[in-house]
Regions:
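PLP-dependent aminotransferase class I/II
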Residues: 4-81, 85-88
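Residue-level recognition of strand-loop junctions within catalytic nucleotide-signaling folds
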Residues: 28, 57, 100-101, 138
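Conserved PLP-binding catalytic core of the aspartate aminotransferase-like
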Residues: 70, 78-117, 133, 137
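Short, hinge-like loop/turn segments at secondary-structure boundaries
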Residues: 1, 24-26, 139-141
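Thr-Gly-centered strand-to-loop micro-motif
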Residues: 9-10, 97-98, 122-124
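PLP-dependent enzyme catalytic core of the Aspartate aminotransferase-like
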Residues: 105, 113-117, 122, 126-159
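Short acidic/glycine-enriched loop/turn segments that link adjacent beta-strands
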Residues: 19, 91, 128-131
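Alpha-helical structural signal in soluble globular domains
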Residues: 1, 75, 79-83, 113, ...
Length: 159
């Protein structure tokens, strides 16, 4: 009974279906009716809807993805803090380590080093976080790669 609250969710994170551009909204009828009037006709195709519905029924996959995410969140936070980095954003599917504002060790320098190693992370300067990088939790191999590269860059061993 909260007339101005709308909950929205995507299928991009836990379900791994970002390319389908599908999601859902739950809220008061008046807000849903407004969304219906504003959205483009045929804004989600039938195949995307079918895949999203199947993903919602695949509880085993969702549980496995959540477990993988939780495990790597803990590992990533621990290893980043061991490198002396502050960590923000310990929920969701990414972490935001804060890098020193020191020439040679800044977020920009770190990003350039990671790119040279084939590791892509996201700069977040445009969100007012010039000393942070967004690291999305990935596969075991991807996580080992980014964490080992960061360890190497920050002056520790690579592994």
């Amino acid at each position: 009974n909260t007339p101005n609250t709308l909950m929205t969710r995507t299928f991009s994170k836990i379900y791994g279906l970002a390319s389908l551009r599908v999601g859902w909204a739950f809220g008061p009828r008046s807000m849903i009716e407004t969304l219906e009037r504003l959205r483009s006709p045929f804004n989600v195709n039938g195949a995307a809807i079918a895949v999203a519905a199947a993903a919602m029924r695949d509880v085993a996959h969702t549980d496995a993805a959540r477990g993988h995410n939780n495990r790597w969140m803990g590992v990533a936070v621990q290893r980043l803090r061991a490198l002396g980095l502050g960590v923000t954003g310990e929920s969701g599917n990414f972490v935001l380590p804060e890098f020193p504002d020191t020439p040679g060790k800044s977020a920009a320098d770190t990003d350039a080093f990671l790119q040279s190693k084939g590791v892509i992370v996201r700069r977040v300067d445009n969100y007012g976080l010039p000393n942070h990088l967004r690291i999305t939790l990935g596969t075991d191999e991807e996580m080992e790669s980014v964490l080992n590269a960061l360890t190497q860059f920050m002056g520790g061993s690579d592994g």
